[in-house]
Amino acid sequence: MFQGASALTLDAKGRMSIPSRHREALQLQAEGRVTVTKHPDGCLMLFPRPEWERFRERIAALPMEAHWWKRIFLGSAADVELDTAGRVLITPELRAAASLERDVMLLGMGSHFEVWDAATYTAKEQAAMAQGMPDALKNFSF
């Protein structure tokens, strides 16, 4: 299970260094193989390959009215491997789709990660906090 936020920097080639606390889990769970694709909220999702296979099967089973989302998720997916330095290459197309230039946030979301442009993430987080909690969380005990 992946959790926590990490402020990271993309290098000139578009590579992102996976924090050491997650590298071992990715090596054990997926032999360093991951898949990156678009997320509907404007960020990217980074899956260990076995989790991606489960997600891909769920997407492929969606009804015909979701065909554009199948294209978005599956058509933009990129299979990559952690290099010897623990970095993942984000393709130029995916970097452009998520407006990733230099400063990024990597968020552990349980079974996968989200990769956000740092400024976009901060703005969206502040907007969510300003709106208050949704009804689904009103009775949640902290």
Swiss-Prot record:
Please verify whether the record's keywords include Transcription regulation: yes
Gene Ontology cellular-component terms for this entry are: cytoplasm; nucleoid
Q: So which domain of life are we looking at?
A: Bacteria
Which controlled-vocabulary keywords does the entry list? Answer: Cytoplasm, DNA-binding, Repeat, Transcription, Transcription regulation
Subunit note: Forms oligomers.
Under the heading InterPro entries, the entry gives:
MraZ (IPR003444), MraZ_C (IPR035644), MraZ_dom (IPR020603), MraZ_N (IPR035642), MraZ_sf (IPR038619), SpoVT-AbrB_dom (IPR007159), SpoVT-AbrB_sf (IPR037914)
Q: What is its main location?
A: cytoplasm
Xref: PROSITE patterns: SPOVT_ABRB
Q: Which SUPFAM superfamilies match?
A: AbrB/MazE/MraZ-like
Q: Which PANTHER family match?
A: TRANSCRIPTIONAL REGULATOR MRAZ
Q: List GO molecular-function terms, semicolon-separated.
A: DNA-binding transcription factor activity; transcription cis-regulatory region binding
Q: Where in the cell is it found?
A: Cytoplasm, Nucleoid
- Which named protein is this? Transcriptional regulator MraZ
Task: Supply one GO BP term.
Answer: negative regulation of DNA-templated transcription initiation
Q: Which residues form the SpoVT-AbrB domain?
A: 5-51, 77-120
